[in-house]
Amino acid sequence: MLASGLLLVASVAFLSVLVLMSVWKQRKLSGKLPPGPTPLPFIGNYLQLNTEKMYSSLMKISQRYGPVFTIHLGPRRVVVLCGQEAVKEALVDQAEEFSGRGEQATFDWLFKGYGVAFSSGERAKQLRRFSIATLRDFGVGKRGIEERIQEEAGFLIESFRKTNGALIDPTFYLSRTVSNVISSIVFGDRFDYEDKEFLSLLRMMLGSFQFTATSTGQLYEMFSSVMKHLPGPQQQAFKELQGLEDFITKKVEQNQRTLDPNSPRDFIDSFLIRMLEEKKNPNTEFYMKNLVLTTLNLFFAGTETVSTTLRYGFLLLMKHPDIEAKVHEEIDRVIGRNRQAKYEDRMKMPYTEAVIHEIQRFADMIPMGLARRVTKDTKFREFLLPKGTEVFPMLGSVLKDPKFFSNPNDFNPKHFLDDKGQFKKSDAFVPFSIGKRYCFGEGLARMELFLFLTNIMQNFCFKSPQAPQDIDVSPRLVGFATIPPNYTMSFLSR
């Protein structure tokens, strides 16, 4: 009895010493790092966070500590930036210092600092420069890609017509359509909508993307060093990511066998040619691992974000039939019913442009942004962030900044309209991030959102099995990503 009592006292004393050391260490750094709740050893601020509502938890902490604060996600120390001012100061005004890539533990299981999206430094710069130039070579930002989107929109509309107004889940209708646009660039061809391998890839992408938004996904962000060895949903996410990598590797091998260095067919060919050109460069970033993982970055990002935004958009328009009716009216007035929408039409369609921007703002696809890392000791406001400090630029807090949007939690296209009903830009519209590492697929995504939505709405009215007032537009999951509720709907020909 005495021995067990002494053991208990010793354990409590040991834990107390650890906590005191943690507090001392935190206070020692308080003159440098932003303030924040005191972390416990290893678990950090886990007890102050709700992994089911990580974004909301962090925003609640910001109410106490201000727009720039420090949080410990398990053993991982992160500086969090909230609101348009703080995020712009970091990502634009001090763009170079904040250009490093932080952790995204689920994706890091596969990428490990390779590929254009999750790399840093010279590797990121070279791969980004090459990717932007190559996408342009294959028509992105030009008439060529617009025609490809219009063609794919035609296939999608035909698929919706075949449903004859029955209730359907639009998830894979949208993802296979959006994915085919980026597929034609990176693989040189589109997939048939019923291709089983294609549908399997889309499920893998959706599964791993949704995992990052779950409570387990957020827990994994804190304790990946332990959880990667344990059974659980994270193992399924790894399996899905591995399946995607295997598919890309197979595609690359097919291209290698039939490569003509004088006539690149797609992004993979262009990268393979660059690899041949830089074969004797010992510092080259153009090798197989970066090819496979950069291609996967483009394929994944070019599929999930736009298709999920459209899926959220359909739900919001069914919730607000008055807004849907105004978009229909503008489409009929500007485009009519006898030709496809063109990207230049948006200049004469301020209301539709405002609706699309408001869908993106409300959907808030990546609310905590892709984590950054400071590339050197960085003075930020009155703080000093040591080199390597991770940073969360909370894009959701910018998209919902009350200084820029009068009712940030409401869906209202007037957020992007002036008093005369003309479209107005906002400095707080940052769904593609800002600064040196903004999403370089932004131009393609904007074109896809406009052309897909207008061409679909030119042909169909949206019908929910629920009355508008009963439709819940609250996200199903919010973590790294925002996932809209599952729903069914009918596409009724106009």
From Swiss-Prot:
Induction: By 3-methylcholanthrene (3MC). It catalyses: an organic molecule + reduced [NADPH--hemoprotein reductase] + O2 = an alcohol + oxidized [NADPH--hemoprotein reductase] + H2O + H(+). The keyword Lipid metabolism does not apply. GO terms for molecular function: arachidonate epoxygenase activity; heme binding; iron ion binding; monooxygenase activity; oxidoreductase activity, acting on paired donors, with incorporation or reduction of molecular oxygen, reduced flavin or flavoprotein as one donor, and incorporation of one atom of oxygen; oxygen binding. One of its GO terms (cellular component) is intracellular membrane-bounded organelle. Its main location: endoplasmic reticulum. Disulfide bonds: none annotated. Pfam families: p450. It is a peripheral membrane protein. InterPro entries: Cyt_P450, Cyt_P450_CS, Cyt_P450_E_grp-I, Cyt_P450_E_grp-I_CYP2A-like, Cyt_P450_sf, Cytochrome_P450_fam2. It is found in: Endoplasmic reticulum membrane; Microsome membrane. It comes from the Eukaryota. Keywords: Acetylation, Endoplasmic reticulum, Heme, Iron, Membrane, Metal-binding, Microsome, Monooxygenase, Oxidoreductase, Phosphoprotein. Cytochromes P450 are a group of heme-thiolate monooxygenases. In liver microsomes, this enzyme is involved in an NADPH-dependent electron transport pathway. It oxidizes a variety of structurally unrelated compounds, including steroids, fatty acids, and xenobiotics. Belongs to the cytochrome P450 family. This is Cytochrome P450 2A3. It comes from Rattus norvegicus (Rat).
